[in-house]
Regions:
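Left-handed beta-helix
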Residues: 1, 192-276
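Short coil/turn connectors at secondary-structure junctions
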Residues: 1-3, 49-50, 74-75, 100-102, ...
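Conserved adenylation A10 loop of the ANL superfamily
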Residues: 10-16
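Conserved beta-strand scaffold positions in the cores of enzyme catalytic domains, especially
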Residues: 28, 78-79, 135-137, 247
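Residue-level signal for inorganic ion chemistry
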Residues: 38, 94, 110, 152, ...
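A residue-level structural signature of the nucleotidyltransferase/glycosyltransferase Rossmann-like core
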Residues: 53, 104, 179, 186-187, ...
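Conserved core of the sugar-phosphate nucleotidyltransferase
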Residues: 115-216, 225
């Protein structure tokens, strides 16, 4: 059983245009202590994982390769999507590439995470739950009533509900209740368990993804076959439907760096000069 860090790197960071562009999305900008968010993700998770598997796309896989090389990571797998088909398919491709008992720790490539000890504790708990056959998501304790994230309603590690991005009044209500967490977009599970649930809950995504993966050549997926895959997020496809779901309530510092405000706050926290 290997623990594999699956890095999803297909996003284009459109909310940060023109800083983030299709030719160089935000995860490849070296503006975080001289490193990119992609590099920081791979290096951070190397402490818990035996290997790295990058699911990227035809537009950015060369950037991923360069970032990994510059970070000193020589050994990795890659799957190159011909066209974006959302996260359910992207994660399915990663699961097909691994052994059924392998634990996949799925992370976006463009998140900034601090509080290393707290992060380590949460990841280790998620891996333990995954080894027991659960599908695990991470719930981040909200620092403010954020309207840009989805929320998870929890009772301990039990998931009571997933909630869409709320309006401000609803977000404030979530904060007051104390058992609502930001949906981080990070997951942990055994490859075989995920595929079993995907096949049961969204058979069309499973079958078309499998057919596409069977024709992979030198890490690259076929565009014509890829276009037949339904474009569905992993939240809708599996997380909100499976009875194997668990959540790890977490308190580490986290940001999806999805706005100029987030970058401003990061630079301010790092002590960089800020225009008044």
């Amino acid at each position: 059983m290997n623990i594999v860090n699956v890095i999803l790197s297909g996003g284009v960071g459109s909310r940060l245009w023109p800083l983030s562009r299709k030719s160089r999305p935000k995860q490849y900008l070296p503006i975080f202590d001289g490193k990119t968010l992609f590099q920081k993700t791979a290096l951070r998770n190397s402490a818990f994982c035996d290997s790295v598997l990058v699911v990227g796309n035809i537009d950015n896989y060369q950037l991923s390769r360069k970032d990994l090389q510059d970070a000193g990571i020589q050994s990795y797998q890659e799957i190159i999507e011909a066209c974006p088909r959302n996260t359910a398919a992207a994660i399915a491709f990663a699961a097909f590439a691994c052994n059924p008992e392998d634990v996949l720790f799925v992370t976006p490539s463009d998140h900034l995470i601090e509080s290393e000890e707290s992060y380590k504790k949460s990841v280790e708990r998620a891996i333990a739950l995954a080894k027991d056959g659960f599908i695990v998501t991470f719930g981040l304790k909200p620092s403010k009533p954020e309207t840009g994230f989805g929320y998870i309603e929890a009772d301990g590690e039990e998931v009571k509900s997933f909630r869409e991005k709320p309006d401000l009044a609803t977000a404030e209500e979530f904060i007051q209740k104390g058992n609502f967490y930001w949906n981080s977009g990070m997951f942990c599970f055994q490859a075989g368990v995920f595929l079993q649930e995907l096949k049961k809950l969204e058979p069309s995504v499973f079958e078309t993804s499998y057919t596409t993966y069977q024709k992979i050549e030198e890490g690259k997926l076929n565009e014509e076959l890829s276009m037949k895959i339904p474009s569905i997020s992993v939240d809708y496809a599996v997380m909100e439907k499976t009875d194997k779901i668990k959540v790890v309530p977490s308190a580490f510092d986290w940001s999806d760096m999805g706005s100029f405000e987030a970058i401003y706050e990061y630079n301010q926290a790092q002590g960089y000069p800020i225009d008044s």
